Swiss-Prot record:
It comes from Cladophialophora bantiana (strain ATCC 10958 / CDC1940 / 8579 / CBS 173.52). Belongs to the AB hydrolase superfamily. Hydrolase RutD family. GO terms for biological process: response to toxic substance. It catalyses: zearalenone + H2O = hydrolyzed zearalenone + H(+). Transmembrane segments: none annotated. This is Zearalenone hydrolase. Signal peptide: none annotated.
């Protein structure tokens, strides 16, 4: 029988009213959402991981979806380091001392910031597709109006899912939340996230790191991830899908998280 899912909210000292979910028991695994900020994307793999002997925690990110009640500074001028500090605070309040941490995109930047800045809290890090530079179509996205951002980012995100049927199946409530999240992301993330990536040698060897990129994505988009991981002799492999493997291929994603985490227990 699948473990029960806890869904609740918690207010941390930085003023963020977090929506969070937990499932399972055992060593802690924290799944950090990508820049779109909605943890519903982890719904299917979370149960698989929780049924495999782990306690899984995830949450909507500050200012996003059901964590929208948050001070503006928590979702403006966002960096991996800023998000890492917020996540340590919520880990403290939830009693999570050490965890294996996964994150994609800005979530991956957050994973690297946790590994570098809070190695005592991280068993192992699993970054997926860390943004190190903005593609041309994001250079001036912060100048666009909210309606244009929501329309364009909905199309881009669907394409980057590499499984449009699974993306659509997230459901109308999730996509309604994402429409607002696209705007907060565009105004708060692209100008500051890429430059915050903790990719120096001194950042990358404090805890074990296993890096991934999407097998279905254009190689050039995240090729710098391959360059950095190779330079630092960090294991790097592909996962099925592109930018959201937990949506497009939930079983394969869960298997990767479980098998990778077990290496470090």
């Amino acid at each position: 029988m699948a473990p029960e899912r806890l869904r609740s909210t918690i207010l941390t000292k930085d003023g963020i009213n977090w929506y969070y979910e937990q499932e399972g028991s055992g060593p802690d695994v924290v799944l950090i959402p990508d820049g779109l900020g909605d943890c519903q994307m982890f719904d299917k793999p979370m149960s698989i991981i929780g049924s495999s002997g782990f306690k899984v925690t995830t949450f909507d990110m500050p200012g996003m979806s059901r964590s929208s009640s948050a001070p503006p500074e928590t979702y403006q001028d966002v960096t991996g380091q800023k998000l890492a500090n917020y996540i340590v605070t919520v880990m403290d309040q939830l009693g999570i001392k050490t965890a294996s941490v996964w994150g994609c995109s800005s979530g991956a930047s957050t994973v690297l910031a946790l590994c570098s800045g809070f190695p005592e809290r991280v068993r192992n890090g699993m970054p997926h597709e860390v943004p190190t530079a903005n593609p041309e179509n994001l250079q001036n996205i912060h100048d666009a109006d909210p309606a244009t951002i929501s329309r364009d980012m909905a199309a881009v995100s669907r394409a980057m899912s590499a499984n449009e049927e699974a993306w659509d199946a997230l459901g109308p409530e999730v996509h309604e939340r994402l429409r607002d999240n696209y705007v907060r992301w565009a105004y708060g993330y692209p100008r500051t996230i890429p430059g915050s990536a903790a990719t120096k040698t001194e950042d990358l060897h404090k805890v074990p790191i296993d890096w991934t990129v999407g097998a279905a994505g254009p190689t050039q988009v995240f090729f710098e991830n391959v360059v950095i991981a190779t330079r630092e002799s960090i294991p790097i492999k592909t996962l099925p899908g592109f930018h959201f493997p937990y949506v497009s291929h939930p079983e394969a994603f869960a298997k990767y998280v479980v098998e990778t985490t077990r290496k470090y227990l």
